């Protein structure tokens, strides 16, 4: 992708302090966007923001008022938000459901599902009023292909996948577009030891399908967010349901 593809665009990335979110932030900045990097850990977002000359915002995405303040701050400092990447998520709480801690289990839902809801809820009225905007939600292949242990993560991502798909459908007649990006196993800090099994494959092309990066690394996946910004890909996205290399390396991009 060439540089300066998104001059004048303002992007807000939640969960932007590390992993996929940090890679998205760097890619968007390289394309010329003004980027706000948001996460709970200030040190992490400040470091990423420093690297890309962006805006660092400390936020708890489960706190409605904090999310509203975040959006207000970003638009005050950078201008109207053109792209929201709702990427914040957690993946802890493993083991059997019957041995899990209910508070820890629910925390996964609060971050992964409520966080996406609150962020979308905060930016959508502004986007609709302006008549433009893109929202990209990070789901997970785990929401379609459940694992045997982490029920909280799989169940929460199933909810995120459907939340995004339903939101996209409800906004189909508006100028605002919503995309759900659901990778398979990804080599990030969140996946921990599982990263050893995360696939590393080249992009796969298929007739009438969006060609997406099927790699499992955060830096490779980041480009998909940029591609979703461009109108010339929308016809393909509308015809693309799924590109799947294997059960553990599936990427769904739904509009």
What name fits each language-model region?
Residues 17-18:
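Conserved glycine-rich cofactor-binding loop
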Residues 59-70, 102:
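The beta1-alpha1 cofactor-binding region of Rossmann-like NAD(H)/NADP(H)-dependent oxidoreductases
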Residues 140:
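Residue(s) in the substrate-gating loop at a strand-loop-helix junction
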Residues 98-117, 132, 136, 160:
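Catalytic Tyr-X3-Lys loop
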Residues 120, 156:
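Active-site helix of classical SDR
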Residues 180-181, 196-255:
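C-terminal helical subdomain
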Residues 68, 91-106, 149-152:
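Conserved mid-core segment of classical short-chain dehydrogenase/reductases
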Residues 145, 154, 166-176, 217-219:
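Active-site-adjacent segment of SDR/Rossmann-fold oxidoreductases
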